[in-house]
Amino acid sequence: YFGGSMSENACFPLLPIFKFLGTKFRNINFYSKMKNDVDMFTKAVFRYDHAVASFQVGLGVKTEGSLTIAGTKGYVYVPAPWWKTDYFEVRYEDQNYNKKYFYPYVGEGLRYEIKDFVVAILTDGYYFSKVSKEENLMMAEVQEIYILGKNVYKL
């Protein structure tokens, strides 16, 4: 699985999922299109107590690149490309309650992750203003679950 879409790209969609829903999901399933034992495309589906989240990552495949986090009362939609967006929407069945949130984002979102990484190196102790220790550990655990082949369905 080394060098595939999960190992190279999964950290990007995992961060907003964990920010919105937390790291305490009930289970996760992966659906992967393999080529020479490397996942070229993977869809992951998380089940939480009161929500579902999914993401798709790929190498050499095209996908919309949007992000959707579904819940029991509505869902969060971040348009493509979600890692560069400057707004997201919270949508409900009654569209009168829908709301768009705008925020300033200088450059690409990766810029903020790099900043936190540099600050962690330059300061004593573990410091991440945007990504918590718990979120980082769970990102690594999701990768481990995938690498060990747990709940991985090859297409």
Per-segment meaning from a language model:
Residues 109:
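Active-site substrate-recognition segment that forms the wall
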Residues 116-155:
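C-terminal helix-rich "cap/oligomerization" subdomain common to oxidoreductases
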Residues 8-84, 104, 114-126:
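Contiguous beta-strand/loop segments that form the cofactor/metal-binding neighborhood of enzyme cores
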Residues 1-5:
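Helix-loop-beta segment of a Rossmann-like dinucleotide-binding subdomain
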Residues 96-106:
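C-terminal "lid/loop" region of Rossmann-like NAD(P)-dependent oxidoreductases
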Residues 67, 84-95:
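Short polybasic amphipathic segments
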